């Protein structure tokens, strides 16, 4: 059996569960990028970002905020997935996600992690607070734009094409 036959053989046996998983991830990407979801998440973060401080200690007030976030955002995503994929089961997807976590785009996995990992949730809020307060990562001083074209001593305004 040559390499091409082995490759097509492997592709033909990808399971139905893999195809379902890929479909859910595709829908998740669409949902997360949708303006309605962005507004929902941003509004929630605007409401609470000042509560979070970059310290080792976690305040007791973080727990109800975390629970409210899970309730609001996870419920929204699950409703959207049910509209797009009838019979969708979040618990089954979460289990499958653990087996496929290396295959999921970082942004999606990070966002899903905020439902189950409190530290990821807190980090999301700390990043948002830093951004709101102008303390975000500024790469502008490290960026240099260089032309790939040969430099000419003639100013661009005088570079007319003549026939």
UniProtKB/Swiss-Prot annotation:
Superkingdom, natural source: Eukaryota
Location(s) in or outside the cell: Cytoplasm; Mitochondrion intermembrane space; Cytoplasm, Cytoskeleton, Microtubule organizing center, Centrosome; Nucleus
Keywords, ordered alphabetically: Cell projection, Cilium, Cytoplasm, Cytoskeleton, Mitochondrion, Nucleus
InterPro entries: ARL2BP, BART_dom, BART_sf
Protein's UniProt keywords contain Nucleus: yes
Listed GO biological process terms: maintenance of protein location in nucleus; positive regulation of tyrosine phosphorylation of STAT protein
Keyword check for Disulfide bond: no
Tissue: Ubiquitous with higher expression in brain, especially in hippocampus and cortex. Also expressed in lung, cerebellum, liver, kidney, spleen and heart (at protein level).
GO cellular component, one term: spindle
GO molecular function, one term: transcription coactivator activity
Subunit relationships: Interacts with GTP bound ARL2 and ARL3; the complex ARL2-ARL2BP as well as ARL2BP alone, binds to SLC25A4/ANT1. Interaction with ARL2 may be required for cilia basal body localization. Interacts with STAT3; interaction is enhanced with ARL2. Found in a complex with ARL2BP, ARL2 and SLC25A6. Found in a complex with ARL2, ARL2BP and SLC25A4. Interacts with STAT2, STAT3 and STAT4.
Role of this protein: Together with ARL2, plays a role in the nuclear translocation, retention and transcriptional activity of STAT3. May play a role as an effector of ARL2.
Protein family according to the UniProt entry: Belongs to the ARL2BP family.
Protein name: ADP-ribosylation factor-like protein 2-binding protein
Species: Rattus norvegicus
């Amino acid at each position: 059996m040559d390499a091409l036959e082995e490759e097509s053989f492997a592709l033909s046996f990808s399971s139905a569960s893999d195809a379902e998983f890929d479909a859910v991830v595709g829908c998740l990407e669409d949902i997360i990028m949708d303006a309605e979801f962005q507004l929902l998440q941003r509004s929630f973060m605007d409401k609470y970002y000042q509560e979070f401080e970059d310290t080792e200690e976690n305040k007791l007030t973080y727990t109800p905020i975390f629970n409210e976030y899970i309730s609001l955002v996870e419920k929204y995503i699950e409703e959207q997935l049910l509209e797009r994929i009838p019979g969708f089961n979040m618990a089954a997807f979460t289990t499958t996600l653990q087996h496929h976590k290396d295959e999921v785009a970082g942004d999606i996995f990070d966002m899903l992690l905020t439902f189950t990992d409190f530290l990821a949730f807190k980090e999301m809020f700390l990043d948002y607070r830093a951004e709101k307060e102008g303390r975000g990562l500024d790469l502008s001083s490290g960026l240099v734009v260089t032309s790939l074209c040969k430099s000419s001593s003639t100013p661009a305004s005088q570079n007319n094409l003549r026939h």
